[in-house]
Amino acid sequence: MTITQFKIQKLENFFGSLPKYATEHSAGMDLIAANKQPIIIKIGEIQLIPTGIAIALPDLFEAQIRPRSGLAVKHGITVANSPGTIDSDYRGEIKVILINLGKEDFIIEKGMRIAQMIISKYERILWKESNTLEETVRGSGGFGSTGV
């Protein structure tokens, strides 16, 4: 396994530990809430939660912010723009956009694990305009066309 090192900065409001993998084979690192006061996410409401960190990714890398399954299953708390994308040229604080799809208000306490961050490599492309596309078995079928 290759381990790559990227820079991370603890900001003034940082709390807890740096993002880390929970197990040897985890794809995502937990992000910790760094809010000064508890944040109440009312039913159906969206809140922006600070993490107290900023990162520097090299070109052709991104960070994806994804929900934690436990928060989603137990409380209906998920990442509103899932997956959120942190571009390689962004140097500000990473913040997580959470939405409450649950049945009761939910409180985000300082130090709570609120999301996962996945680091991914990607490719940049150029579009080649065409009047036709290659045929496939699926064709233009979508939105349940292959079965439910």
Curated annotation (Swiss-Prot):
HAMAP family: dUTPase_bact (MF_00116)
Reactions accelerated catalytically: dUTP + H2O = dUMP + diphosphate + H(+)
CDD domains assigned to the protein according to its UniProt record, in alphabetical order: trimeric_dUTPase
Pathway per the UniProt entry: Pyrimidine metabolism; dUMP biosynthesis; dUMP from dCTP (dUTP route): step 2/2
NCBIfam families: dut, PRK00601.1
Job description of the protein: This enzyme is involved in nucleotide metabolism: it produces dUMP, the immediate precursor of thymidine nucleotides and it decreases the intracellular concentration of dUTP so that uracil cannot be incorporated into DNA.
First-tier enzyme category under EC: hydrolase
Protein origin, superkingdom: Bacteria
Gene3D superfamilies: 2.70.40.10
Gene Ontology biological process terms, A to Z: dUMP biosynthetic process; dUTP catabolic process
UniProt-recorded Gene Ontology molecular function terms: dUTP diphosphatase activity; magnesium ion binding
Keyword Transcription regulation: no
Residues binding substrate: R68, S69, G70, N81, T85, I86, D87, K95
Family under the similarity heading: Belongs to the dUTPase family.
Source organism of the structure: Rickettsia canadensis (strain McKiel)
Record SUPFAM superfamilies: dUTPase-like
Cofactor section: Mg(2+)
Keywords annotated in UniProt: Hydrolase, Magnesium, Metal-binding, Nucleotide metabolism
EC number: 3.6.1.23
Protein name, UniProt field: Deoxyuridine 5'-triphosphate nucleotidohydrolase
GN (gene name): dut
